[in-house]
């Protein structure tokens, strides 16, 4: 469902999916329901859906709303999973954290993992850690984008064309992240391999430390 008819029709045409004009209409036949609304809209949506959620596996990507809140407000939902994906999912390089509710079966958990693994990597965490996940991987892309922009700006300041500087910065971040993931080597060790004694890299790292990069 979508409140804008044109968007519903566009999704139907693009993916060949069933659409509905109301949330209740959509949930009647759905085995899996994804709650993807603003936190301030959730109460109204759950009130509308009510007992129709009882038969379905409910996946919530609503930031800051607990499983308990959803169960209490939904009036029947017992199989609830909280998920925190991030925007790199748009290019299938996302990171999603999942917190499983008490009523979620192993089959349910496997299905949810499969869904989110189509757009990146998945990790299961205790629900009490979801706020930390939100700050790290949920908001993390924004921090990385700013770092890429800063690296590129430095390159431009040194005379590189903007497009070249952005490519150098983005690919450096991408490759470095992949090296961490695939090598299994601690980032500190990888950093030390780049920093020669008395070289430019260690000088740059010193400046980052002096200016509160870790803070």
Label each PLM-derived region with a short phrase.
Residues 18-23, 123-125:
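Short acidic-hydrophobic, aromatic-tinged amphipathic segments that line or gate anion-handling sites
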């Amino acid at each position: 469902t979508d409140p804008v008819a044109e968007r519903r029709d566009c999704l139907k045409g693009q993916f060949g999916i069933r659409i509905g004009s109301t949330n209740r209409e959509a949930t009647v036949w759905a085995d899996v329901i994804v709650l993807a609304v603003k936190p301030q809209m959730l109460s109204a949506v759950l009130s509308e859906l009510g007992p129709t959620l009882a038969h379905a596996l409910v996946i919530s990507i609503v930031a800051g709303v607990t499983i308990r809140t959803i169960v209490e407000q939904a009036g029947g939902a017992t199989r609830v999973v909280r998920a925190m994906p991030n925007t790199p999912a748009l290019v299938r390089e996302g990171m999603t954290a999942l917190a499983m509710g008490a009523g979620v079966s192993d089959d349910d958990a496997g299905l949810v993992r499969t869904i989110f693994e189509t757009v990146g990597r998945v990790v299961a965490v205790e629900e009490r850690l979801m706020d930390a996940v939100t700050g790290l991987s949920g908001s993390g892309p924004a921090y990385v984008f700013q770092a890429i922009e800063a690296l590129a700006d430095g390159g431009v300041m040194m005379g590189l064309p903007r497009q070249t500087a952005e490519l150098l910065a983005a690919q450096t971040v991408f490759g470095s992240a992949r090296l961490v993931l695939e090598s299994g080597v601690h980032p500190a060790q990888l950093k030390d391999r780049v920093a020669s004694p008395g070289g430019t890299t260690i000088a740059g790292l010193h400046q980052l430390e002096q200016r509160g990069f870790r803070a």
